[in-house]
């Protein structure tokens, strides 16, 4: 049984930890608001960009003039996975959730006999995936020194992906990230980048009755648009990730603060009981000694 001094020290230690978790919760809450606004602002642009891409892609079709980033290599033997996670922890299961989602996809591809290459954006995903797939990781993007995610960060990743494609390093590229839904809900998401996929907006483009004319021509526009779209989609993924990370961190620190409060109450109760028992014992000894006299 711990002594009164040990219990007192533990109570003080838990109280100090509670102050830290409470402060981290408040910081995460402040950052969450800004991150959520940035993520929500990026969605319409990225969705509209994909819609425009789908419309122009329909005009070009399978024409020989269509850029390789849209048509692909015609194979799907080698897959490049760009996995976006956080640089830091203390955000519950946020990082493990997206890493697990990507890991399951890697296992599925390997079981099909495909070659897999991975680019890790964020330290935590890198730490998790390298335990099993260290030989598959070809690059790691370090954003620890980046205070605010900017388009230039996504653009560098996009250029790296396109450079690898032009060198014939892969056939299909898929982006993995956590889509922010709410403070307690972040959904692991996979989005194909190459060959350029219009995704759910393709149906919208199919049903559109408008007819567009393109200058100089649709293929030339696609050649410029697809690389930008890749960077835009990566940028949106990074912003969604930041919002999800802050939401998960705020929730985790809130739980930690409440758990610390419960632990303090239990330790204080235990401390008071032991102190009461000790005082009672001393009183009994005093009374017994007085009666003996």
From Swiss-Prot:
Membrane topology term reads:
Peripheral membrane protein
Listed under GO cellular component are: plasma membrane; proton-transporting ATP synthase complex
> One GO BP annotation here?
proton motive force-driven plasma membrane ATP synthesis
> What is the protein's major site of localization?
membrane
SUPFAM superfamilies named in the record = ATP synthase (F1-ATPase), gamma subunit
Please state which protein family the record places this protein in: Belongs to the ATPase gamma chain family.
Protein name listed in UniProt:
ATP synthase gamma chain
What is the species listed in this Swiss-Prot or TrEMBL entry? Sinorhizobium fredii (strain NBRC 101917 / NGR234)
Q: Which gene encodes it?
A: atpG
């Amino acid at each position: 049984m711990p002594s009164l001094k040990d219990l007192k020290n533990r109570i003080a230690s838990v109280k100090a930890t509670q102050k830290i978790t409470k402060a981290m919760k408040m910081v995460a809450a402040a950052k969450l608001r800004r991150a959520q606004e940035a993520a929500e602002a990026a969605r319409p642009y990225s969705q509209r960009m994909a819609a425009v891409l789908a419309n122009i892609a329909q005009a070009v079709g399978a024409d020989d003039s269509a850029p390789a980033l849209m048509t692909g290599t015609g194979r799907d033997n080698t897959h490049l996975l760009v996995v976006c996670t956080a640089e830091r922890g203390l955000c519950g299961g946020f990082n493990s959730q997206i890493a697990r989602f990507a890991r399951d996809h890697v296992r599925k591809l390997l079981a099909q006999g495909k070659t897999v290459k991975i680019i890790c954006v964020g330290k935590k995903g890198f730490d998790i995936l390298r335990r099993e797939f260290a030989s598959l990781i070809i690059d790691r993007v370090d954003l620890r020194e980046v205070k605010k995610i900017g388009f230039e960060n996504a653009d560098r990743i996009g250029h790296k992906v396109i450079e690898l494609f032009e060198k014939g390093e892969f056939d299909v590229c898929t982006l993995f990230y956590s889509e922010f839904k709410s403070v307690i809900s972040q959904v692991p998401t996979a989005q194909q980048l190459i060959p350029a996929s219009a995704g759910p907006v393709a149906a919208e483009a199919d049903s559109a009755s408008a007819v567009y004319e393109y200058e100089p021509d649709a293929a030339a526009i696609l050649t410029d648009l697809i690389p930008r779209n890749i960077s835009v989609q990566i940028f949106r993924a990074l912003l969604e990730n930041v919002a999800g990370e802050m939401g998960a961190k705020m929730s985790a620190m809130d739980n930690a603060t409440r758990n610390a409060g419960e632990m303090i109450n239990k330790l204080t109760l235990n401390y008071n009981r032991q102190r009461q028992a000790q005082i009672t014992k001393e009183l009994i000894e005093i009374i017994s000694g007085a009666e003996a006299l």
